[in-house]
């Protein structure tokens, strides 16, 4: 067996033993959960390993606990906090919480259940040792708290929240559980989570991290993926710069990158399908589509107010209605050997003089065909590559 001995500094005679469960004997990082520590105390941890031959004890590591709060009963968080309700900026909580406790936590974060402001300033919360119980309303949507679930609206509108570690036994994160948490940068997801839906309005969110022990999800570069790594579950809106889709991806779902902050996308030839509105209202400036994509779906780049350059894949066959509506394209590159079919409103655009300001780039020898086309011929400037 392996684990560590835990004791208060200066009191090694009172040490307790914490054992790693289901230890397989392999080398590498090992995670060990240690509970029931005193607040604001000085501890030492001594790693050990034991077999039939004997025991090896490593050098002690010192650790200072913080002002963690432990609940013995549901509904008592408000009482425990007392006059200190609005003083915390960082907090760890242990115990069982219901809707009443979560509502108190919202107050500490600066919002009540009607989204009215409070003096709270809590921004960093660790709920690892929390068990979520059913009962009691929480959040501006007034949903009832549920067992092991972060229900819709639980933290909605908590603009001061920057970082949250979810309960170790939480199984569900409902849609918009963190809606409009505009300062939230990171969410840590436990191994137990099996159902996750994204939240809108998390404009600063840069990373969703997942326990390596989670069998349903994984995180890559801060992006939440399914376990197979070929589908985006939640793309953080605050992630910036360039993004190259992992080669395992074969499709991008509807609205997958809606409102995201990535400025340049590169899609491999493995991507075969794009969902409707996949990049709608995003901050994208440039995108390179791979040869695997044949259909440009409805509204895929609608509302992309910074999008100026689009490179269509070599096998593009069809462009659907309103694909670029509201996008101020300056250059559209078409490399297909056959002229793609366009629906009647494929290039309908709120941008004034779209056909005059966007340069259409076509393969060598095909300029005349595009100029004589009913829809493609509307472009004032057509150049051969």
Residue ranges of each PLM-predicted region?
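Acidic Gly/Asp/Thr-rich repetitive segments characteristic of extracellular carbohydrate-active
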Residues: 68-88, 106
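Helix-loop-beta element that forms the nucleotide-linked donor phosphate-binding surface
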Residues: 373-378
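Structural signature of tandem-repeat unit edges
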Residues: 67-72, 89-97, 114-149, 158-172, ...
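Short, surface-exposed linear motifs at loops/turns and structural transition points
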Residues: 1-66
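A short acidic, amphipathic alpha-helical/loop segment
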Residues: 80, 101-108, 345-346
């Amino acid at each position: 067996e392996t684990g560590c001995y835990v004791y208060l500094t200066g009191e090694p005679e009172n040490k307790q033993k914490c054992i790693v469960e289901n230890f397989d004997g392999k080398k590498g990082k090992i995670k060990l959960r240690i509970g029931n520590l005193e607040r604001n105390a000085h501890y030492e941890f001594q790693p050990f390993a034991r077999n039939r031959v004997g025991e090896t004890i490593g050098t002690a590591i010192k650790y200072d606990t913080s002002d963690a709060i432990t609940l013995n009963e549901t509904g008592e968080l408000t009482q425990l906090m007392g006059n200190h309700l609005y003083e915390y900026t960082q907090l760890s909580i242990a115990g069982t919480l219901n809707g009443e406790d979560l509502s108190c936590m919202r107050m500490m974060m600066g919002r009540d259940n009607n989204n009215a402001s409070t003096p709270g300033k809590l921004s960093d919360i660790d709920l690892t040792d929390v068990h979520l119980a059913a009962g009691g309303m929480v959040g501006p949507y007034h949903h009832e708290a549920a067992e092991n679930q972060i229900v819709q609206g639980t933290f909605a509108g908590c603009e001061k929240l920057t970082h949250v570690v979810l309960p170790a036994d939480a199984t569900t994160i409902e849609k918009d559980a963190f809606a409009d948490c505009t300062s939230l940068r990171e969410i840590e997801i436990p191994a137990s989570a099996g159902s996750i839906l994204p939240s809108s309005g998390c404009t600063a969110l840069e990373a969703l991290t997942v326990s390596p022990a989670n069998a349903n999800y994984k995180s890559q570069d801060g992006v939440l993926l399914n376990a197979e790594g070929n589908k985006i579950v939640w793309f953080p809106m605050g992630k910036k710069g360039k993004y190259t889709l992992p080669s395992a991806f074969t499709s991008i779902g509807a609205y997958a990158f809606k409102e995201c902050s990535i400025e340049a996308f590169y899609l491999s030839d493995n991507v075969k399908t794009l969902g409707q509105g996949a990049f709608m209202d995003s901050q994208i400036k440039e995108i390179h589509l791979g040869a695997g994509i044949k259909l440009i779906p409805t509204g895929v780049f609608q509302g992309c107010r910074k999008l100026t350059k689009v490179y269509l894949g070599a096998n593009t066959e069809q462009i659907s209605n309103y694909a670029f509506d509201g996008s101020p394209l300056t250059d559209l590159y078409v490399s297909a050997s056959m002229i793609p079919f366009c629906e009647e409103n494929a290039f309908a655009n709120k941008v004034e003089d779209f056909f005059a300001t966007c340069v259409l780039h076509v393969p060598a020898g095909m300029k005349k065909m595009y100029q004589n086309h009913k829809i493609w011929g509307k472009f004032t400037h057509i150049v051969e590559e």
